[in-house]
Amino acid sequence: MDGTDAEAPGQTAPSRAESLVAHAEASISEDALLAAARERAVDIGAGAVTPAVGALLSLLTKLSGGKAIAEVGTGAGVSGLWLLSGMSDDGVLTTIDIEPEYLRLAKQAFAEAGIGPSRTRLIGGRAQEVLTRLADEYYDLVFIDADPIDQPDYVVEGVRLLRPGGVIVVHRAALGGRAGDPAARDAEVVAVREAARLIAEDERLTPALVPLGDGILAAVRD
């Protein structure tokens, strides 16, 4: 036997893939602080990473060294809490969002988790403008979870921010499968494909696409 799991009779490949993702999501439990932050995100209509994506973010952050992390798209702080859980005790999370209410709720989530103000830097404004002010080759990990239309711009800036050995992580890299549908050609799909192309063609990066959440494209910089 080759060790490959056989499909059950009548079980199609897509349903098996969906079962694997569902199992991955069910394997991660969130504490009360994360649950409260997630509930606030739902209340205001802010997107939030799934628990499995959050666990992956924590893992990648820890593997990267986790001292300087940049996040594009704060939301209500769910992803920020996961990132902080993988960071060193003296690490600083820089997180950017254009919505003041999102930043307020994220600040609340961080405070409830006992994370001191010296460990987070919340910046309001357009990410395209804020990112240009951040230091070159300084960050261990850059997480992009914002409007897919702007992914190419964020990828260019995000790679610039990465130190050698750093990791860039792009959420919504599959758009629920639309990015892989040859017939899909709307503006979001075109932008997401362009972001993926930029990463794939950058010889400094080693990428992988992970089918969790809305698709995670991660790449480490040489």
From Swiss-Prot:
Top EC category: transferase
An example Gene Ontology biological process: methylation
Under the GO molecular function aspect, what terms does this record hold?
O-methyltransferase activity; S-adenosylmethionine-dependent methyltransferase activity
Source organism of this protein record: Mycolicibacterium paratuberculosis (strain ATCC BAA-968 / K-10)
Q: What is its EC number?
A: 2.1.1.-
Name by which UniProt lists this protein? Putative O-methyltransferase MAP_2558
**Similarity-based family:** Belongs to the class I-like SAM-binding methyltransferase superfamily. Cation-dependent O-methyltransferase family.
- Native organism taxonomy: Bacteria, Bacillati, Actinomycetota, Actinomycetes, Mycobacteriales
Check the record and name the InterPro entries matching this protein. Cation-dep_OMT, SAM-dependent_MTases_sf, SAM_O-MeTrfase
